[in-house]
Amino acid sequence: MTDVMRDVASLRMLQGMWRRAGETVGLVPTMGALHDGHMALARAAREECGKVIATIFVNPTQFGPTEDLDAYPNTFDSDLHMLREVGVDVVFAPTRDVMYPAGFGTTVKVAGLTAPLCGAARPGHFDGVTQVVAKLLNLGQADRAYFGQKDWQQLAVVRQMVRDLNFPTEIVGIPTVRAEDGLALSSRNAYLTEAEREIAPILYRTIRDAAARVAAGHGATGVCEAAARGLLGKGFTRIDYLECRDATTLAPAETPDPGTARIFVAAQLGGARLIDNVSVG
């Protein structure tokens, strides 16, 4: 039976019992509106750890003032059912007041990796991400924490934070889960109309083809610019970025060695901002 906890004291008490019993703890941070991508994280944690905590918290500090905080899907009952099916031990679902009580004033900022891509398109976003992840890692006291590779930049930022601040947690990246037509699973896919959902898989095909061209020796800048124009001609209304960057440093990569770079994209389609990335070579 999966327990639902909303306060820190209860979670701490349970963790103390687990630690005394020598359990390995896995943490799966989410904002809810779960799909098979989240379930891949939970299943990996279940397979590798004696105890698993999943968190459901829509973190307000990682949303900009014009973004979709108020519209973000709330599907708690179905989320809980899915997590129970996987065998998660505890769902930690705090309120905003629990996470950010009156007088809260601490931020965590990772320099460098947060500057390009989503960091440039969504100022302040990663400050909110590192703030909440630092809190969840502290509260979860996990041996391992699981993140999806669809949010590659987020994964890189969290790994940097964990290294820099000496968190005793291994950050585990899980490959992107896709629909049969290639679209990366995302909670924000729910914003797509039926017609937009037909268009959406073009995003993955476009960056996959761009990655193949860069791997074949074509210059990344020209390839990515052409790919972005192609998306705008097929129904996407804005391209925040479509770039080839080093997979580790996120520095621009014009003619990368095989396996060292990725093509990153963020594009608006109707009411949904879709992100994805693929390896070059």
Curated annotation (Swiss-Prot):
One of its GO terms (molecular function) is pantoate-beta-alanine ligase activity. It holds the Pfam family Pantoate_ligase. SUPFAM superfamilies: Nucleotidylyl transferase. The active site is at residue 38. Beta-alanine binds at residue 62. Its main location: cytoplasm. It is found in: Cytoplasm. (R)-pantoate binds at residues 62, 154. Keywords: ATP-binding, Cytoplasm, Ligase, Nucleotide-binding, Pantothenate biosynthesis. It is an enzyme of class 6 (ligase). Its EC number is 6.3.2.1. Pathway: Cofactor biosynthesis; (R)-pantothenate biosynthesis; (R)-pantothenate from (R)-pantoate and beta-alanine: step 1/1. GO terms for cellular component: cytosol. ATP binds at residues 31-38, 148-151, 177, 185-188. InterPro entries: Pantoate_ligase, Pantoate_ligase_C, Rossmann-like_a/b/a_fold. The keyword Nucleotide-binding applies. Transmembrane segments: none annotated. One of its GO terms (biological process) is pantothenate biosynthetic process. Catalyzes the condensation of pantoate with beta-alanine in an ATP-dependent reaction via a pantoyl-adenylate intermediate. The reaction proceeds by a bi uni uni bi ping pong mechanism. Belongs to the pantothenate synthetase family. This is Pantothenate synthetase.
